[in-house]
Regions:
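Conserved beta-strand in the GNAT
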Residues: 39, 45-53, 58-65
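Conserved acetyl-CoA-binding loop-helix of GNAT-fold acetyltransferases
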Residues: 66, 72-89, 97
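A short beta-loop-alpha structural element at the N-terminal edge
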Residues: 1-12
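C-terminal "cap" of GNAT-fold acetyltransferases
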Residues: 119-147
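Short beta->alpha linker loops
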Residues: 7, 56, 100-101
């Protein structure tokens, strides 16, 4: 697992599309904040991705995908865990996500379903919320604040 580079863009977009995940805004995020986009590689082939779109103390977890034949090996769990640790270390206090297929998978990290109206305005204005994901997508959140 390593930070992505713009050279990974084609492979990452292909991976996201193979999972029917939105790619709107992904290239811009990768160019602006490559440190917030992680890739997993196997034999020099991109097999996983996860990204954080950071807006001050809030972040949107997006673009989590793993090659289908490697899905049971914990690659996705490692990608998400690494990004959440990075987020916490950089001062992010809350992470949100949208999903249409994985609402049962994210609670293992502490995410809970939340109301769309509770999403901070800066995240609600992102392309994921306004264009890329359907209004029927499940919204989940995780607090990284230490009590």
């Amino acid at each position: 697992i390593r930070p992505a580079t713009v050279d990974d863009l084609f492979a990452l977009v292909a991976l996201l599309r193979s999972h029917d995940l939105p790619v709107d805004g992904f290239a811009d995020l990768l160019r602006a904040s490559p440190q917030h986009v992680l890739v997993a590689e196997l034999n020099a082939v991109v097999v996983g991705s996860a990204a954080l779109d950071v807006h001050g103390p809030h972040a949107l977890l997006r673009s989590v995908a793993v090659a289908r034949d490697l899905a049971a090996l914990g690659v996705g769990k490692r990608l998400v865990s690494d990004l959440l640790a990075q987020a916490k270390a950089s001062g992010v206090t809350s992470v949100y996500l949208l999903t249409t297929t994985a609402a049962a998978w994210f609670p293992k990290f502490g995410f809970t379903v939340t109301d769309r109206a509770r999403v901070p305005a800066d995240l609600a204005a992102t392309v994921e919320f306004t264009k890329a994901c359907p209004a029927s997508a499940t919204v989940m959140s995780l607090s990284l604040s230490t009590p």
